[in-house]
């Protein structure tokens, strides 16, 4: 006759469930050596190498085949996302550079137009300086003409005086080419004579 266990707990403690067994792993995983050329090669080349061999940044010795496969798939997805993000960033950078080049070109065009306008303004300023100098020369010439006219008037007065002095002793009439200068002071009235007085005797 089979003996019954004293309790159900004893029977459960004696048996071991295979599902609860845990795999023992080494406490300190071995560090993965990164290839030296991975630190010096360009980013694009590194992304290509990671797509081909994702295990270059993982340690397959520490995982089972299924874990390593899932890890490789995750690395591939990550590399793909990084590549897509880098392509998007490259497109954004190209667009930004295109906008900057367009702005620089527009700035150069406006600068050239400003230079042309500045040259034209400078030329107009040169003409205005020439006109100003010509006006000053005309003023100087006008003053010289006035001085010459005054000199001619003085010469005519001297000629009249000479003609008058030579014509005093002769009967030749004197030609008044120049009128006599006006009196400085007005002529005072003369005193009345005794004949002009109206005296009642």
Curated annotation (Swiss-Prot):
Main location per the UniProt record: host cell
UniProt keyword annotations, A-Z: Host cytoplasm, Host nucleus, Host-virus interaction, Inhibition of host innate immune response by virus, Inhibition of host RLR pathway by virus, Inhibition of host TBK1 by virus, Inhibition of host TLR pathway by virus, Phosphoprotein, Viral immunoevasion
Positions of short motif Nuclear localization signal 2: 181-193
Region (Disordered): 1-70, 176-201
Gene Ontology BP term (one): exit of virus from host cell nucleus through nuclear pore
InterPro entries linked: BDV_P24
PTM per Swiss-Prot/TrEMBL: Phosphorylated by host PKC epsilon and casein kinase II.
Domain of life of the native organism: Viruses
Subcellular location: Host nucleus; Host cytoplasm
Note: The P/X gene has two overlapping open reading frames. One encodes the P protein and the other the X protein. The P (p24), X and P'(p16) proteins are produced by ribosomal leaky scanning.
Protein name as annotated: Phosphoprotein
Name of the gene encoding the protein in the UniProt record: P/X
